[in-house]
Amino acid sequence: MEQRASLDSEESESPPQENSCLDPPDRDPNCKPPPVKPHIFTTRSRTRLFGKGDSEEASPLDCPYEEGGLASCPIITVSSVLTIQRPGDGPASVRPSSQDSVSAGEKPPRLYDRRSIFDAVAQSNCQELESLLPFLQRSKKRLTDSEFKDPETGKTCLLKAMLNLHNGQNDTIALLLDVARKTDSLKQFVNASYTDSYYKGQTALHIAIERRNMTLVTLLVENGADVQAAANGDFFKKTKGRPGFYFGELPLSLAACTNQLAIVKFLLQNSWQPADISARDSVGNTVLHALVEVADNTVDNTKFVTSMYNEILILGAKLHPTLKLEEITNRKGLTPLALAASSGKIGVLAYILQREIHEPECRHLSRKFTEWAYGPVHSSLYDLSCIDTCEKNSVLEVIAYSSSETPNRHDMLLVEPLNRLLQDKWDRFVKRIFYFNFFVYCLYMIIFTAAAYYRPVEGLPPYKLKNTVGDYFRVTGEILSVSGGVYFFFRGIQYFLQRRPSLKSLFVDSYSEILFFVQSLFMLVSVVLYFSQRKEYVASMVFSLAMGWTNMLYYTRGFQQMGIYAVMIEKMILRDLCRFMFVYLVFLFGFSTAVVTLIEDGKNNSLPMESTPHKCRGSACKPGNSYNSLYSTCLELFKFTIGMGDLEFTENYDFKAVFIILLLAYVILTYILLLNMLIALMGETVNKIAQESKNIWKLQRAITILDTEKSFLKCMRKAFRSGKLLQVGFTPDGKDDYRWCFRVDEVNWTTWNTNVGIINEDPGNCEGVKRTLSFSLRSGRVSGRNWKNFALVPLLRDASTRDRHATQQEEVQLKHYTGSLKPEDAEVFKDSMVPGEK
């Protein structure tokens, strides 16, 4: 019998090459030969690229080019010629096999290996696979056996066929599914996935969805494909600096993130295995979280993401009326709304905050309710759930305390209702508390300055208290100063424990807190030195005093013009000045070491050599005008930086030309080059900040507002909470739908004629509306020349609202709710829908 073996490559399109060798005639043709040892020139197995410590290449999903690999399992075929040795005969006689084993005209059975199957499915050649089922049944094998899978990636012939579609189809897919069904391995075969670390978990259903093929998706689901299979390989994870596509791992999320609404509806509504709309991936993200993750703030992307988000939300409400899909959090404790805020997806954030659904059965999904409209002016109620600071991981906290690298951080605070909510908090209580704190801090610094100025100077500390009025005032001032230092110290500790800023964002986002904390440290060190009878306490005290007056700039954020100026100073110190100082110190140290090497004390070129009584170098030589030390030379070179240097500050050197060249080079690099670069960089920083100065100032004020709220007790936070508890309709189970809402009056001259509606009679005839409108009128926002710049208009409009072409009725009369509400202070807001109509 002839034994054939071929080098296997899963991607090759050429027929296998065979090498024959003699085999004993009595050997079973179906027996499995021993494994072939790998060739010494075969390539190593590929593993993932981006794992820790990995350096190998990442393999593609499918490639038509051949790559060296291990030898495949040998192919066993029936030879057409047999060599038989009989007793008594002479030399071995050769005769045709048809005389003993195979009848004339009968074809030998077709045998398959991984390579032959892969080649057939890649070419969509069903004829090559006609004998596959008899072969598997005869050999008692299945397509899910390891010998029919890629040893490196775990790819099966079904996955190979899904990756090689011709005009959107591959005829071998149905054939392979039928073969797997008849070999009792259909479910395992359909759900077989990649096993390598890069594409781990990807199944045929994922590929069919990615190929946007509804027919194949239906075929796979009908045959038992797992609609909850998770593709969690490295390629499907979101890691900074790594190429890949994160879509939420699940097939439903993949269909949603690739904008395939038909497949989304099929996965949720099919009768074979409906997908779980609330399923979460390995990081706890649902399909809504995944949609937020794939948003990139471009117009087209935002439009498709918000549209898909809206469709899934409505579909989920119809399939599972009591499920609160938007309230599901991931492992970081973030809802889709909070995730949009933390990642800077301003378009998605604006859509969610301003979503208004008019369908009666889905109106409970709205976060915005239009209360009344009159011309271009309309009053809206915004749901404050997940927005206000009363809840954990609220949108306001996420935006205000996010990293400075978060995109659109400043602009997100201008989206309604965030902009008006912060303004309401500032006007109602934060402004008064902030100004009071400013007054107290000024008083504290005055007392601290007086206590430091009138400190005793005779003797060693601690000083005895004299029975004089001045000493009593001094000691009282010292006690108050130390108490303030202790307060700022523990406040800084509390801040760092709560926020836990990273080292990268520590100096950028926590600039003011660090300065107050350092001020308190200097004060506490001064106290320790004072009671240790060390007069050095004065040095630490004056540093604390200087930083205390500098930190008064923190309170300029309560005033727009001064707040912007303080922001510019902070940015220039952190960005421009730090970089300048690093380069300048390198130049200063380098040229100082060069100059001090040339200087020799006692060496004077203008005097004879006999007049130099001695030569010395280093710290041991201390004449009156010695420059033979690094410290004194650095001071002299620093004078050159500010234009006060003298090229002949010493003559104790040899090689005068070299000395002058060093000084001139230093002056050119520092005084002419570096200082002018610093001025240019500062000018650029000022221009950048000036363009968005108001937004930056609003962010600083927002942080101040939230810090003030956090300083309250829980009972006080509820008392100062913005908005009111209102009834906005009914829940899906027929109960009253109470929301904590905040009223915002808006003006829109663009679409006002398509949104004319009067929800309440006598628009504006309520206390809250009067208060809001009167505030706007007092601010001059609606009067005369400022009407077009009415500040009630949100910066970002809901994409679904812009695309809605259906006009509404000009006047909508809604029924009044006459029943009693459980919350006594709740205002009633209902639409025309009654519970029986739902």
UniProtKB/Swiss-Prot annotation:
Gene name of the record: Trpv1
Binding site for resiniferatoxin: 511-512, 550, 557
Species assigned in the record: Rattus norvegicus (Rat)
Extracellular-side positions: 454-471, 532-535, 600-626, 650-657
Recorded consequence of changing residue 648 to Q: Minor modification of pore attributes
Topology class, membrane: Multi-pass membrane protein
Binding site for Ca(2+): 646
Name of the featured protein: Transient receptor potential cation channel subfamily V member 1
Effect of residue 761 to K/Q: Abolishes capsaiin-evoked current and binding to resiniferatoxin
Binding site for Na(+) 1: 643
SMART domains hit by this protein: ANK (SM00248)
Post-translational modification: Phosphorylation by PKA reverses capsaicin-induced dephosphorylation at multiple sites, probably including Ser-116 as a major phosphorylation site. Phosphorylation by CAMKII seems to regulate binding to vanilloids. Phosphorylated and modulated by PRKCE, PRKCM and probably PRKCZ. Dephosphorylation by calcineurin seems to lead to receptor desensitization and phosphorylation by CAMKII recovers activity.
Reported impact of residue 115 to D: Abolishes capsaicin-evoked current and binding to resiniferatoxin
Miscellaneous comment text of the record: Responses evoked by capsaicin, but not by low pH and heat, can be antagonized by capsazepine.
Lineage, opening ranks: Eukaryota, Metazoa, Chordata, Craniata, Vertebrata
